[in-house]
Amino acid sequence: MRVSVANHLGEDAGHLALRRDVYSGLQKTPKSLPPKWFYDTVGSELFDQITRLPEYYPTRAEAEILRARSAEVASACRADTLVELGSGTSEKTRMLLDALRHRGSLRRFVPFDVDASVLSATATAIQREYSGVEINAVCGDFEEHLTEIPRGGRRLFVFLGSTIGNLTPGPRAQFLTALAGVMRPGDSLLLGTDLVKDAARLVRAYDDPGGVTAQFNRNVLAVINRELEADFDVDAFQHVARWNSAEERIEMWLRADGRQRVRVGALDLTVDFDAGEEMLTEVSCKFRPQAVGAELAAAGLHRIRWWTDEAGDFGLSLAAK
């Protein structure tokens, strides 16, 4: 069956975006970096380790829901096309593909990601395992290229892993509204959201005793050193995970052990860190069930199903246009 890859990003788009984000973020107060720059090869491997840690429950909880409810998702949405926002070849993706195939409706898979190499790997794996399924991969950015997602058929858009939580309320509303704008009558959205719970348990999920998450957090500095000719002393920053109760979100920071002057050669930029100064590297917003429904409604979507895992740690919403 046909495989196509539509690349809407230039070859140097990722590098240019990194330059913009680092130049802007290092001059803010407090300094900050977007979490997408964690994920080079090393960072992706570290995150895979994180998802298997006993303290990190979200991946297991979401998979538990999908094992129990994928058939219900398939029956409720009656989709023939699975659009995966943030491509992957995980067990969770396969559970949904299998449910649609078992129902007899699966015709097309549309992985959407900013990373062309990830898309290529995804397309190859899915083509091998799901013969007869048309694959239309889209390489693009959520902020610019949602309109490039192929139309036609009944589409199930899937945004899992509580990745939506990396967006603060304003950008999150903009994203959901933009996504609803490209959906057509008959289309559905399956959205994964991590739920508000005991603060100590949340912090443990982002600050494991083995230090894997700390390595993952510091890796963003190694990425900048390599890609932008910077000289961060990576080991002179400590990982900090903190629950912000007012905003109901986990925040990850990097705290400088001592004063440090950093030169970013590719940007002709020099920045100073004071001892104890913290730089924000990720927010992970947590959600309450009613609030998720309200945010979907504000974007023009109607939630038709709501599921949680047995412990009530994680929620999946199925919403329709």
UniProtKB/Swiss-Prot annotation:
Q: Which residues bind L-histidine?
A: Y56, N166, Y206, E282, V283, S284
Question: What does the record give as its pathway?
Answer: Amino-acid biosynthesis; ergothioneine biosynthesis
Describe the reaction catalysed, as an equation: L-histidine + 3 S-adenosyl-L-methionine = hercynine + 3 S-adenosyl-L-homocysteine + 3 H(+)
Gene Ontology, cellular component aspect: plasma membrane
A Gene Ontology biological process term = methylation
Pfam families recorded: Methyltransf_33
Q: Where does S-adenosyl-L-methionine bind?
A: G86, K92, D113, D141, F142
Please give one Gene Ontology molecular function term for this protein: protein methyltransferase activity
Stored SUPFAM superfamilies: S-adenosyl-L-methionine-dependent methyltransferases
Q: Which UniProt keywords apply?
A: Methyltransferase, S-adenosyl-L-methionine, Transferase
Q: What is its EC number?
A: 2.1.1.44
Q: Which InterPro entries match?
A: EgtD, EgtD_Actinobacteria, EgtD_Methyltrsf_superfamily, MeTrfase_dom, MeTrfase_EgtD-like, SAM-dependent_MTases_sf
Its subunit composition reads:
Monomer.
Which family, according to UniProt? Belongs to the methyltransferase superfamily. EgtD family.
What NCBIfam families has UniProt attached to this entry?
Answer: egtD_ergothio (TIGR03438)
HAMAP family tied to this protein: EgtD
Task of the protein: Catalyzes the SAM-dependent triple methylation of the alpha-amino group of histidine to form hercynine, a step in the biosynthesis pathway of ergothioneine.
The name on file for this protein is Histidine N-alpha-methyltransferase
**What organism, scientifically named, is this protein from?**
Mycobacterium tuberculosis (strain ATCC 25618 / H37Rv)
